[in-house]
C-alpha cells in the first residue's frame, strides 16, 4: 500500500503538482540562496544572448527540482523537454532526443544518476562541444559520424549525487543542492495552493499540515489534498486547524510526520539499545527492499537527527526515544 508521506511521486502527483506549481521565481517559496544565484546567472546569460551552463540539482525527492527546471525554462523563454534516465536505455534513445532539440532548448533529465556508462559517453561531447558522436558498424570497419547539435542547456536532477560519475558531474557548470523546507515556508506554500483549490487555509491549519509534512513540499501538497476532502465532505470553505488535525490523525500521520512504517523503523532501532543494525537486517525486518529504506524512509530521519549511520549500521539517537515517548538510560549516549 502507498504511504501518504511517501516522497516518491504517485501517479496522480504529476498533474496535481503541475496545477499548483509556480511558473516563475516570484511565486517560488524557499531555497533562497539557489533562487538568488539562478536569477543572476539567468540575467547574465540573457544579457549575453547565450544558453545557460548545464545545471545539476541534487537533494531528497519532492523538494522542487522539477519545478525549478520549469521556472528556468520560463525565465529563459526556452522550450523544455523532459525525460527520465530509466527511459534512456540505448545510445540511440539519447541521440533521438538530442537531435530533436532546437537552439536554446532545455533538456531536463530526472534521476540522472541512473544513466548507464555507455549513455554517459554519448552525453559528454554533447555537453562539452554540442556534438554527437555516433559509431556505425563494429570492429575494424566501424566508423564515427559526428553530428553538430544546437546549443542547449542540460538540467539534471538526482536524489543520489554520490552515484554520479566524476566525469559527468564535472561537466555541470552549476551545481545546487536543495535543502529541506522550514515549516513556515511550507505553510506559505500550502496557503497559496489552497487558494488555487478554491479553499482558504487558516495559518494554524497550514502550520499543522506543514509540521507533519517531513519538511517536503510534495508531501505537504498531497496532505493538503486529503485535508481538503475532509473539508468538502463537511461543506467547509475554510480549512481550520481542527479539521486539519482530524484529517491528519485519520490518515495515520502523527505530529512529527511519522506514519506506521517510520514508527516500526524507529521501534526496531530503539529496541536494539544502541547496538548498530545493518541495512540488510532492517530491510528484512520491515519487509522492504534496501533502496526503499535508504531513499524513502531514512533521509528525513537522518536530516532531523532521529538516527545515525555508522560503519557497523544504524543506531537510534536520544531524539528517537523521545519521539516514541520511551525512557532510556543516559549512559547509552555517553562516549
Swiss-Prot record:
Has 3 domains, the large (RuvB-L) and small ATPase (RuvB-S) domains and the C-terminal head (RuvB-H) domain. The head domain binds DNA, while the ATPase domains jointly bind ATP, ADP or are empty depending on the state of the subunit in the translocation cycle. During a single DNA translocation step the structure of each domain remains the same, but their relative positions change. It comes from Campylobacter jejuni subsp. jejuni serotype O:2 (strain ATCC 700819 / NCTC 11168). HAMAP family: DNA_HJ_migration_RuvB (MF_00016). The RuvA-RuvB-RuvC complex processes Holliday junction (HJ) DNA during genetic recombination and DNA repair, while the RuvA-RuvB complex plays an important role in the rescue of blocked DNA replication forks via replication fork reversal (RFR). RuvA specifically binds to HJ cruciform DNA, conferring on it an open structure. The RuvB hexamer acts as an ATP-dependent pump, pulling dsDNA into and through the RuvAB complex. RuvB forms 2 homohexamers on either side of HJ DNA bound by 1 or 2 RuvA tetramers; 4 subunits per hexamer contact DNA at a time. The keyword Cell cycle does not apply. This is Holliday junction branch migration complex subunit RuvB. GO terms for cellular component: cytoplasm; Holliday junction resolvase complex. InterPro entries: AAA+_ATPase (IPR003593), AAA_lid_4 (IPR041445), DNA_helicase_Holl-junc_RuvB (IPR004605), P-loop_NTPase (IPR027417), RuvB-like_N (IPR008824), RuvB_C (IPR008823), WH-like_DNA-bd_sf (IPR036388), WH_DNA-bd_sf (IPR036390). Residues 1-181 are annotated as: Large ATPase domain (RuvB-L). One of its GO terms (molecular function) is ATP hydrolysis activity. Gene3D superfamilies: 1.10.8.60, P-loop containing nucleotide triphosphate hydrolases (3.40.50.300), Winged helix-like DNA-binding domain superfamily/Winged helix DNA-binding domain (1.10.10.10). Homohexamer. Forms an RuvA(8)-RuvB(12)-Holliday junction (HJ) complex. HJ DNA is sandwiched between 2 RuvA tetramers; dsDNA enters through RuvA and exits via RuvB. An RuvB hexamer assembles on each DNA strand where it exits the tetramer. Each RuvB hexamer is contacted by two RuvA subunits (via domain III) on 2 adjacent RuvB subunits; this complex drives branch migration. In the full resolvosome a probable DNA-RuvA(4)-RuvB(12)-RuvC(2) complex forms which resolves the HJ. One of its GO terms (biological process) is DNA recombination. It catalyses: ATP + H2O = ADP + phosphate + H(+). Pfam families: AAA_lid_4, RuvB_C, RuvB_N. Keywords: ATP-binding, Cytoplasm, DNA damage, DNA recombination, DNA repair, DNA-binding, Hydrolase, Nucleotide-binding. It comes from the Bacteria. Its EC number is 3.6.4.-. DNA binds at residues 309, 314. ADP binds at residues 21, 28-29, 62-67, 181, 218. Residues 255-335 are annotated as: Head domain (RuvB-H). Belongs to the RuvB family. Residues 182-252 are annotated as: Small ATPAse domain (RuvB-S). Signal peptide: none annotated. It is found in: Cytoplasm.
Amino acid at each position: 500500500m502507498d504511504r501518504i508521506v511517501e516522497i516518491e511521486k504517485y501517479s496522480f502527483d504529476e498533474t496535481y503538482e503541475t496545477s499548483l506549481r509556480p511558473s516563475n521565481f516570484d511565486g517560488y517559496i524557499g531555497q533562497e540562496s539557489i533562487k538568488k544565484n539562478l536569477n543572476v546567472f539567468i540575467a547574465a546569460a540573457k544579457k549575453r544572448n547565450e544558453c545557460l551552463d548545464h545545471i545539476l540539482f541534487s537533494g531528497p525527492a519532492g523538494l522542487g527540482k522539477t519545478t525549478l527546471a520549469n521556472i528556468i525554462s520560463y525565465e529563459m523563454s526556452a522550450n523544455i523537454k523532459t525525460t527520465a534516465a530509466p527511459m534512456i536505455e540505448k545510445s540511440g534513445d539519447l541521440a533521438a532526443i538530442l537531435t530533436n532539440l532546437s537552439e536554446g532548448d532545455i533538456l531536463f533529465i530526472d534521476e540522472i544518476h541512473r544513466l548507464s556508462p555507455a549513455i554517459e559517453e554519448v552525453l559528454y561531447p554533447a555537453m562539452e562541444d554540442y556534438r554527437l558522436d555516433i559509431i556505425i558498424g563494429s570492429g575494424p570497419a566501424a566508423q564515427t559520424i559526428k553530428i553538430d547539435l544546437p546549443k542547449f542547456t542540460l538540467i539534471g536532477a538526482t536524489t543520489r549525487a554520490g552515484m554520479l560519475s566524476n566525469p559527468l558531474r564535472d561537466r555541470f557548470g552549476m551545481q545546487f543542492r536543495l535543502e529541506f523546507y522550514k515549516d513556515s515556508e511550507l505553510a506559505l506554500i500550502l496557503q497559496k495552493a489552497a487558494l488555487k483549490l478554491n479553499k482558504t487555509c487558516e495559518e494554524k491549519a497550514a502550520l499543522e499540515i506543514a509540521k507533519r509534512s517531513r519538511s517536503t513540499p510534495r508531501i505537504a501538497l498531497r496532505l493538503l489534498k486529503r485535508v481538503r476532502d475532509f473539508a468538502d465532505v463537511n461543506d467547509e470553505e475554510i480549512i481550520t486547524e481542527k479539521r486539519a488535525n482530524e484529517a491528519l490523525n485519520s490518515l495515520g500521520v502523527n505530529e512529527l510526520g511519522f506514519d506506521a512504517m517510520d514508527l516500526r523503523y524507529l521501534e526496531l532501532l530503539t529496541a536494539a539499545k544502541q547496538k548498530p543494525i545493518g541495512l540488510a537486517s532492517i530491510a528484512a525486518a520491515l519487509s522492504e527492499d534496501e533502496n526503499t529504506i535508504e531513499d524513502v524512509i531514512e533521509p528525513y530521519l537522518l536530516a532531523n537527527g532521529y538516527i545515525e549511520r555508522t560503519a557497523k549500521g544504524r543506531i537510534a539517537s536520544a531524539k528517537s526515544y523521545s519521539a516514541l515517548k520511551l525512557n532510556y538510560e543516559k549512559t547509552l549516549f555517553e562516549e
